[in-house]
A protein has these predicted regions:
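Conserved ABC ATPase "signature" C-loop
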Residues: 218, 516-517
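The feature captures the beta-strand-to-loop junction immediately N-terminal to the Walker
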Residues: 41-43, 337-339
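ABC ATPase NBD Q-loop/coupling interface
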Residues: 65-81, 361-378
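Conserved ABC ATPase signature
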Residues: 140-144, 148, 438-442
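Helix-to-loop junction immediately C-terminal to a conserved catalytic motif
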Residues: 56, 352
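Conserved ABC ATPase "signature" region
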Residues: 118-136, 415-433
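Catalytic Walker B motif of ABC-type/P-loop ATPase nucleotide-binding domains
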Residues: 165-168, 463-466
Length: 582
C-alpha cells in the first residue's frame, strides 16, 4: 500500500527578487502512512511550515519529489486532487479567509467542488457546529478575534472532508477552552481514520501524537514516538526544545518521590502517579500566600469604567468592552487574560491611543486620552505596542531597516546601529546573521521577534504586548520571558495579554480576567490562579504547575494554594519530605 505522503530527498530554496537564496529544506526523506497522527516540532526557522506547504503542493520542491496519494506534486494537473486529499489550517488564519461572511467562507471550498447546495449547506452547518462558531455564522470575519478566525479556517477545511489535515500552529492563538476543543477534534478525527499532522511549539500537544518528527535547520533531527523523543532530553534541549511541563515537574519531584517513573508526559498522568499524602495534620496546612500591596507604588496607567462598541449605530454593532477598570503601577508587570473575543486586544489598543475612549476614562502617565488636544505622538513615544500578529506591523524589505524605522522617525542618527543591535540582542536575534535577512524569508516566530525588536528599539517607557510568545519555540519563549523580566527590573512597565497561563505565571505580578468585555476577576497572580473553579467557569485554567499542586492538595499534601512556579512546588515537597512529615 502506498504511503499517503512521501518525500524523497526533497530540498527547497526561497529566492528573493534580487536573486538571494535561502535554503529552507535539505535532503528530506519521510513517509507518512494513512491514519497516522504525527507532531512536527522544531525551533523557529527550522523549516516546519515550509515542509507542511509541500504536503498539499502549495510549495514545490527545488530538488527531489513529493508524492501525495501517489500523485507527484510537480504535475500541476494533480493539484486539485492533492488539495482535496490534504487540507491545511495555516499559522495565520487571514491567509486563507476569502469571504466577507463567516458561513460563506466555510462554503467556499465545497462550492468549488461543484457539490449540490443541500450538501454544501450540511457541510457548512456541521463544520461550524464542530468548532463552536454557529452563533457567529453571519458575522464578518474581520470583526472576529484571532482565535475565532482560527476556528473559521478550521471549519473551512473540515467542510472539504479531506483524508489528511495539516494543523500549522493552529492552537497558538486560542484560549485554553478553544485549544482543548481543537485538540479533542484532532483526536476524534484521528480515531475516525483521518491522518493528522500537527505542527506545534507546545510539547504537551506533541505528546498526544503517535509519532514525533523533530526538525533542525531544514533537516530531520529526530523521528520516533513521543516517549522515545522525550527520553533524550539533552538532544532535545540542544535543538531549542524542551520536555512537556508535566514531564519537567515529574523530573524535579523524582528525587523526593522516586515512584514517579519516566514517560509522565501529561498533567493527568502525573497527578495519577503521585502518591497520596500520609499523616496529614492540620498544623501542616499553609495559609494562602498573598502578594503584599506596595502602597508606595506609583500608578502609571489608570482605566476607569471604559466601554467600547465597534460599528456603533449599525446592524453590525458589537459591544467589546463594558465598564472595565484597571490600574497598572509604574515598573510593574500586569497581565490581561480571557477567552478569545473577551476584549483583551481592544483594551490594549486603548492604552496607546489606537482606540480612544467612547465611555469612561483612560490616563497614561500625564496624558488623559479623552483630552481634545491630546499629544498622541507623545503618547506613542511613551507606549510601544507589539501586535498579536506581527505581519501587521512589518513593512520593510530587510530586518535591519525594519528595526531601525522607528528610531529614524524619532531622529536617532548617532547611535542608530547600536540601538538596533541592542534591540535585536534583547529578542535573541544575532545582529550580523539577521540584519540583512529579507523579512519574507523569516518564520512566524522570527517575525514576532523582529516586531518586538522594532518596538524595543524606540526605548518606550511602557511596553504593551498582545500574545508576546505565541509562535515561539520553547527556548525562544523562555529567553523572551527572561529578558522581559530583566527589562522590567530596569524600569520598563509591562502590560500584556496571553492565552498561555504558563507565561502569565512566569511574568505577571497581577492579573485581570476579562469575560464578555467585563473585568470579572483581578488580583495577584497567585490569588487568581488559586481560584481554579472560577477560572473554569470563565473558560480558562491555571498553569500546569498550579493544577499539579491542586491535585496534590486533593491527595492530602499540605501545599500552599496558588503555587505558580515549578521551583516553589519542588521546594515545598522537598521540605515536607525532608521534615519527615509524609
Amino acid at each position: 500500500m502506498l504511503p499517503l505522503i512521501e518525500l524523497d530527498h526533497v530540498g527547497f530554496e526561497y529566492i528573493s527578487p534580487d536573486g538571494q537564496t535561502f535554503q529552507a529544506l535539505r535532503d528530506m526523506s519521510i513517509k507518512i502512512e494513512e491514519g497516522e497522527y504525527i507532531a512536527i516540532v522544531g525551533a523557529n526557522g527550522s523549516g516546519k511550515t515550509t515542509l507542511a506547504r509541500h504536503f498539499n503542493a502549495l510549495l514545490l520542491p527545488t530538488s527531489g519529489t513529493v508524492l501525495v496519494a501517489g500523485r507527484d506534486t510537480r504535475e500541476r494537473l494533480n493539484h486539485p486532487a492533492i488539495r482535496k486529499t490534504v487540507g491545511m489550517v495555516f499559522q495565520f488564519p487571514e491567509d486563507q479567509i476569502v469571504a466577507t461572511v463567516v458561513e460563506e467562507d466555510v462554503a467556499f471550498g465545497p462550492e468549488n467542488l461543484g457539490l449540490e447546495p443541500v450538501e454544501i449547506r450540511k457541510r457548512v452547518d456541521d463544520a461550524l457546529k464542530e468548532v463552536d462558531l454557529w452563533e457567529q455564522r453571519l458575522r464578518p470575519p474581520h470583526l472576529l478575534s484571532a482565535g475565532q478566525l482560527q476556528r473559521v479556517a478550521l471549519a473551512g477545511v473540515l467542510a472539504m472532508l479531506p483524508r489528511c489535515i495539516v494543523f500549522d500552529e493552529t492552537t497558538a492563538m486560542l484560549d485554553p477552552a478553544g485549544r482543548r476543543m481543537v485538540l479533542e477534534n484532532m483526536d476524534r478525527l484521528h480515531r475516525n481514520g483521518m491522518t493528522i499532522i500537527s505542527i506545534t511549539h507546545f510539547m504537551e500537544e506533541a505528546a498526544r501524537a503517535d509519532r514525533m518528527i523533530v526538525m533542525s535547520h531544514g533537516e530531520i533531527a529526530m523521528d520516533g514516538t513521543p516517549q522515545q523523543v522525550f527520553s533524550n532530553e539533552e538532544q532535545l534541549t540542544g535543538l531549542g526544545l524542551d520536555l512537556p511541563p508535566a514531564a519537567r515537574i515529574a523530573r524535579g519531584l523524582r528525587p523526593y518521590l522516586p515512584e514517579l517513573g519516566d514517560g509522565l508526559l501529561t498533567t493527568e498522568s502525573l497527578i495519577r502517579a503521585i502518591p497520596s499524602f500520609k499523616g496529614l495534620s492540620e498544623k501542616f496546612k499553609y495559609p494562602l500566600t498573598l502578594v503584599e500591596e506596595n502602597s508606595r507604588a506609583k500608578p502609571l496607567i489608570s482605566v476607569k469604567n471604559l466601554a467600547h462598541t465597534y460599528l456603533s449605530g449599525t446592524p453590525l454593532s458589537y459591544r467589546a468592552l463594558t465598564d472595565v477598570s484597571i490600574q497598572v503601577d509604574e515598573k510593574s508587570a500586569f497581565g490581561i487574560v480571557g477567552v478569545t473575543g473577551s476584549g483583551k486586544s481592544t483594551l490594549l489598543q486603548h492604552l496607546n491611543g489606537l482606540l480612544l475612549p467612547q465611555e469612561g476614562t483612560v490616563k497614561i502617565g500625564p496624558y488623559d486620552m479623552s483630552e481634545p488636544k491630546l499629544d498622541i505622538k507623545a503618547v506613542r513615544r511613551m507606549v510601544g505596542l507589539v501586535f498579536q500578529i506581527p505581519e501587521t506591523q512589518l513593512f520593510e524589505q530587510y530586518v535591519g531597516d525594519e528595526i531601525a524605522y522607528g528610531p529614524r522617525l524619532l531622529g536617532v542618527k548617532q547611535n542608530l546601529r547600536e540601538q538596533v543591535r541592542w534591540a535585536m540582542e534583547m529578542v535573541g536575534l544575532d545582529f550580523d546573521s539577521y540584519k540583512d535577512r529579507l523579512t519574507f524569508t523569516l518564520s512566524g516566530g522570527e517575525r514576532r521577534k523582529v516586531a518586538l525588536a522594532s518596538v524595543l528599539s524606540m526605548k518606550p517607557d511602557i511596553l504593551l504586548l498582545d500574545e508576546p510568545a505565541a509562535g515561539l519555540d520553547p527556548a525562544a519563549r523562555r529567553d523572551l520571558l527572561l529578558k522581559l523580566k530583566q527589562m522590567q527590573a530596569q524600569g520598563l512597565t509591562l502590560v500584556f495579554s496571553s492565552h498561555q497561563m504558563e507565561d502569565m505565571a512566569v511574568l505577571a505580578e497581577r492579573l485581570t480576567v476579562l469575560k464578555d468585555g467585563r473585568d470579572t476577576l483581578t488580583g495577584s497572580t497567585g490569588e487568581v490562579f488559586s481560584q481554579s473553579e472560577k477560572l473554569k467557569e470563565l473558560g480558562l485554567e491555571p498553569p500546569v504547575v498550579t493544577r499539579v499542586a491542586e491535585g496534590m492538595r486533593k491527595l492530602g499534601w499540605p501545599l500552599n494554594s496558588g503555587i505558580t512556579s515549578r521551583a516553589l512546588l519542588i521546594e515545598e515537597v522537598g521540605q515536607l519530605i525532608g521534615a519527615g512529615i509524609r
